[in-house]
UniProtKB/Swiss-Prot annotation:
It comes from Dictyostelium discoideum (Social amoeba). CDD domains: TRX_family (cd02947). This is Thioredoxin domain-containing protein, mitochondrial. Keywords: Mitochondrion, Transit peptide. Belongs to the thioredoxin family.
């Protein structure tokens, strides 16, 4: 089960990179809602989405943690999360899976819609 993954942290700029060993600490134990971006690092369309996602999170006054998982480096973790295509974004709150989006967002407003849903669900838990 995902909750049994042990701890360690790797930071890259203000974005966090989850590894098999850091997933529990970065995602499941976070006090903030977490947006997990799963992608292979070489895949250009997801780099554009990552920039848009980062900007949308900034607009939300850093209400969220943004965590990236490199599909190629962390294949077993991606497999646990049942990732089958890219880009895939997953929202977590209080260690619980809330929502998954696979494929590109049509616009920044759709990214904000996704974030609003996660934020609303997170507030219900507190």
């Amino acid at each position: 089960m995902i909750r049994n993954i042990s701890k360690s942290i790797v930071n890259l700029n203000s974005q966090k990179i989850a590894t098999n060993t850091s997933f529990k600490e970065l995602v499941l134990e976070s006090k903030k809602p977490v947006i997990v971006d799963i992608r292979p690092c070489y895949y250009t369309p997801t780099k554009f989405l990552n920039k848009e996602l980062f900007e949308a999170i900034k607009e939300k006054n850093d209400t969220f943690e943004l965590v990236t998982i490199d599909f190629d480096e962390e294949y077993e973790l991606a497999k646990l999360l049942k990732i089958q295509s890219f880009p895939t974004i997953i929202g977590f709150s209080n260690g619980n899976f809330l929502k998954k989006h696979t494929g590109p967002f049509r616009s920044k407003s759709h990214i904000l819609e996704f974030l609003n849903h996660i934020e609303t669900e997170h507030k219900k838990k507190y």
